[in-house]
Amino acid sequence: MELRKITTPRLTTACRFHGRPDGRKLLLIHGNASSSVFYEHIMERLEDKFCMAAPDLRCFGDSDALPVDATRGMRDFSDDIHELVEALGWDKFIIFGWSMGGGVAMQYAIDHSDKLDGMVLQSPLSPFGFGGTYGEDGKKLEPLGLGSGAGCANVQLIAALQSGDRAFIASVIDSIYVAPPFQIAP
């Protein structure tokens, strides 16, 4: 597993690379509240079949913490991905997107379908962002853009985030996001 930083005109992206250099190219896009680290286990299992890259999206992991224009849906992330694959010289590849990464992958497919050999989505959100949308033009389910995400939030976790209760936050991350024996320091 190799971690490199790739600088494009848009930003510097931290990216994990693994697999066969001559294998089919597979780009793995992580979800919200995660990073490319989440794909290390999968990359190890697929190392004999694919040439893989797993970038940290902007504001995540070790990539530049640049602002995101929410009015563009997933397009800031998708544009970053396009610059990255151009810098890597990838002409054709399979894109895999999980959660928010699925929305990024769909936006990439809308804008650059000619670059894709395939797309795999795992529990994706809309390419139009976090508000509830429908249809190919991203029409809002209701005028304020409500209808996804926060309605399912854990009230205790929100209170811990507001009060700075790092021990509770670490326990949530340990139980949901990471595998033993790894633990988040309180």
Q: Each PLM stretch: what is its role?
A:
Residues L11-A70, L84:
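Conserved HGGG/HGGXW glycine-rich cap/lid loop of the alpha/beta-hydrolase fold
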Residues V120-Q122, P127:
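A short, hydrophobic beta-strand element of the alpha/beta-hydrolase
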Residues M1-T12:
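N-terminal cap/lid segment of alpha/beta-hydrolase-fold proteins
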Residues K140, S148-P186:
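Alpha/beta-hydrolase
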Residues G102-S113, M119:
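Short glycine-enriched nucleophile-adjacent loop
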Residues L28-G31, S99, P124:
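Glycine-rich His-Gly loop
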Residues E44, A53-M100, I110-D111, S126, ...:
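Active-site loop/oxyanion-hole signature of alpha/beta-hydrolase fold enzymes
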Residues K25, K49-C51, D91-I94, K115-G118:
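Structural signature of beta-strand start/N-cap positions in the alpha/beta core
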